[in-house]
């Protein structure tokens, strides 16, 4: 494939403006899409961007995690809020974090008092707040309070014992073996089944029990050592580790909701739906952190649910959860995982989503896995997270692997579920070597994939002692780029405004499962500017119109569907209709890129064409208030110069999000993009 021309050296801005023309100086959350912000205006015959672009609302601001990680004071909270606002940041997530003194415990009166002060101060400043539902994470235990209220709500797991090798009178995984070689479960331990392995005929006992103390914990809010110094190696210092809750148990989750969500409402209800926009739940995980060896996620009565969900008796296949040499072990593990995810939807996400809907706030945050699109149907603001350098500029991870699907996962869910916003928590644990350029690249990587609410991880209340090394870096007031932050924050507001209350113009979809989104065909589409959305398979049997012309859902019309993963049975009737109409593209590893693109182009004419070709250019086309916008991002490391032909014709206005500058783009003028640069082309006077 021919790359677009690489322009060596730094691009001169005057030369750039000469190529493109003359420079001109320049609400409600939960629920369905609305339209506001105005359309492009004529000023003395000149087309200008709408007011929503020039002066975007604070509602589209970055909303950083604000790590409350040291002794708090009202004076310092107010000072930091003023600093946020002065730098263009109008929203924040109150995130209690490791380093808090013990007298500010999770949901304690002092913590609630400081939260109330921060919320009231935000209201006075026309800022907005997201509350965080755990101390610290993953969500579901209220910092151990769920288990403290009822020990039966501790995380549970399944354990296996090979009865042919276990010695009589011994203890295996906490389960006693009788003199006759049979298991003797204690109180709180339940024998699920004794089945024979298909591989060698051994008898396997499967028992469910609570995870032992010290395992399946969450990260806590207080350092183990009182006021520890920073370590010489800059490693994190130990914090307390409260026990995780059983998020597969609906009663445990109901307790969690009462202790956290209802408490928030009781304390701050006058601000719900106003200053308090949402509550953030963070990657609820079956076994929380530090899982006990040999444990498989489960809970009391889980086998009955698994059998009902799968439609067959799973009991004979239980050994496959531990032994990979059992016949079709991977298949049965996938089936069990799908059943667990279904259970989690019912016990956790559905309960919390219903509570949020009834109390006027949005459920925001993200599930545990990057392609868990199924759980996002329960979020009023579907979201995902980029942490631990899972995605990096110049690395294959931007296009390959499960993590590469996460931005499209959330934005596709937003579209198909009729939501208004989708979010991403990003930059967390990228390390002290993280740069402002990397942060901008990640932002643009998300924006061009449809994200419109960004939660930077994080702004640190304090960097005293070891706090500076807790999942670094600080990407706000304690960063080296804070003085340069305002133009960046303003650009994010413009781009999030653009991606909100707009229609994504795209006629290609890639089929996904509730817990798996394929990336290989997606990579080809990205590199050839064929935009797409992920369509979760169950939509095909729930809320789509499928006929010989394609798929219609939530205002979208997909004329082609790429199928890479094996679809579920319920989706096959709809897929048969599409296949007979010639609108199904079955991708496999033997299909080369040109064949895939040829099949796409026969069904969906290319919306944009780039000459010379460039695999580093990403394009998103949206319609907002009657105007067409093309978001164009150079995801690569080279300066690029190329001609961009769009299917929509008219006067082209080039918008610079950083400086609110716009220029007329001459019809034959090439587009020049520096590495990691993003521009927006508005089509006016069509």
Name these PLM-found stretches.
Residues 2-24:
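N-terminal secretory signal peptides and thylakoid transit peptides that target proteins
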Residues 96-254:
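Acidic/aromatic-lined carbohydrate-recognition and catalytic surfaces
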Residues 253-275:
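An active-site-proximal structural segment forming one wall of the substrate-binding cleft
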Residues 62-63, 75-78, 91-92, 106-135, ...:
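Carbohydrate-binding surfaces of carbohydrate-active enzymes
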Residues 54, 84-86, 411-417:
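Acidic (Asp/Glu)-rich catalytic clusters
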Residues 49-80:
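Mature N-terminal segment immediately following signal peptide/propeptide cleavage
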Residues 9, 31-47, 630:
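C-terminal segment of N-terminal export signals and the immediately downstream linker at the start
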Residues 42, 47-49, 61, 95:
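N-terminal hydrophobic targeting/anchoring segments and the immediately downstream early-domain regions
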């Amino acid at each position: 494939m021919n790359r677009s021309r690489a322009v060596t050296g730094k691009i001169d801005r005057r030369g750039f403006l000469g190529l493109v023309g003359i420079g001109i100086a320049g609400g409600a959350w939960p629920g369905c899409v609305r339209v506001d912000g105005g359309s492009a205006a004529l000023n003395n015959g000149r087309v200008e961007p709408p007011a929503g672009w020039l002066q975007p609302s604070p509602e589209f601001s970055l909303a950083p995690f604000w790590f409350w990680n040291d002794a708090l004071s009202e004076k310092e909270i107010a000072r930091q809020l003023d600093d946020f606002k002065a730098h263009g940041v109008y929203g924040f997530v109150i995130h209690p974090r490791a380093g808090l003194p013990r007298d500010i415990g999770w949901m304690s009166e002092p913590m609630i008092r400081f939260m109330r002060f921060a919320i009231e101060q935000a209201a006075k400043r026309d800022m907005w707040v997201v509350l965080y539902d755990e101390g610290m994470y993953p969500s579901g235990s209220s910092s151990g309070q769920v288990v403290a209220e009822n020990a039966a709500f501790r995380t549970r797991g399944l354990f296996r014992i090979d009865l042919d090798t276990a010695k009589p009178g011994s203890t295996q995984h906490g389960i006693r073996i009788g003199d006759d070689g049979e298991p003797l479960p204690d109180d709180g331990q339940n024998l699920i089944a004794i089945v024979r392995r298909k591989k060698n005929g051994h008898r396997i006992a499967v028992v469910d029990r609570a995870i032992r103390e010290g395992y399946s914990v969450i990260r806590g809010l207080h350092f183990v050592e009182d006021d520890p110094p920073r370590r010489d190696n800059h490693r994190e210092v130990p914090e307390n580790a409260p026990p995780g809750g059983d998020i597969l148990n609906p009663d445990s989750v109901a307790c969690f909701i009462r202790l956290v969500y209802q408490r928030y409402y009781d304390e701050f209800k006058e601000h719900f739906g106003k200053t308090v926009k949402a509550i953030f739940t963070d990657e609820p995980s079956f076994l929380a952190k530090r899982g006990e060896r040999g444990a498989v996620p489960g809970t009391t009565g889980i086998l009955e649910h698994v059998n009902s969900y799968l439609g067959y008796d799973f009991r004979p296949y239980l050994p496959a959860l531990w032994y990979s040499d059992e016949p079709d072990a991977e298949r049965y593990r996938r089936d069990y995982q799908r059943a667990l995810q279904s259970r989690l939807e019912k016990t956790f996400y559905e309960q919390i989503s219903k509570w949020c809907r009834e109390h006027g706030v949005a459920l925001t945050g993200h599930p545990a896995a990057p392609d868990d699109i199924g759980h996002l149907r329960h979020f009023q603001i579907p979201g995902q997270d980029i942490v631990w350098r899972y995605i990096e500029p110049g690395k294959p991870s931007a296009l390959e692997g499960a993590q590469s699907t996460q931005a499209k996962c959330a934005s596709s869910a937003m579209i198909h579920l009729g939501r208004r916003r989708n979010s991403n928590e990003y930059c967390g644990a990228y390390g002290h070597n993280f740069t402002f350029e990397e942060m901008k690249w990640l932002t643009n990587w998300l924006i061009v994939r449809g994200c419109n609410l960004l939660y930077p991880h994080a702004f640190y209340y304090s960097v005293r002692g070891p706090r500076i090394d807790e999942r670094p870096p600080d990407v706000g007031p304690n960063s080296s780029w804070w003085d340069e932050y305002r133009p960046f924050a303003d650009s994010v507001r413009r781009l999030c405004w653009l991606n909100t209350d707009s229609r994504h113009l795209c006629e290609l979809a890639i089929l996904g499962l509730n817990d798996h989104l394929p990336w290989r065909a997606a990579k080809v589409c990205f590199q050839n500017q064929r935009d797409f959305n992920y369509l979760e398979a169950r939509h095909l049997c729930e809320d789509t119109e499928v006929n010989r012309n394609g798929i219609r859902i939530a205002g979208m019309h997909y004329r082609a569907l790429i199928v890479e993963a094996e679809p579920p049975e319920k989706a096959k009737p709809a897929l048969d209709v599409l296949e007979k109409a010639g609108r199904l593209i079955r991708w496999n590893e033997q299909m080369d890129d040109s064949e895939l693109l040829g099949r796409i182009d026969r069904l969906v004419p290319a919306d944009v064409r780039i000459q010379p070709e460039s695999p580093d250019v990403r394009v998103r086309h949206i319609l907002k208030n009657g105007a067409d916008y093309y978001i164009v991002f150079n995801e690569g490391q080279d300066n690029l110069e190329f001609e961009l032909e769009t299917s929509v014709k008219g006067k082209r206005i080039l918008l610079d999000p950083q400086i609110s500058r716009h220029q007329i783009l001459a019809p034959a003028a090439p587009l020049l993009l520096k590495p990691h640069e993003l521009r927006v082309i508005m089509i006016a006077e069509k």
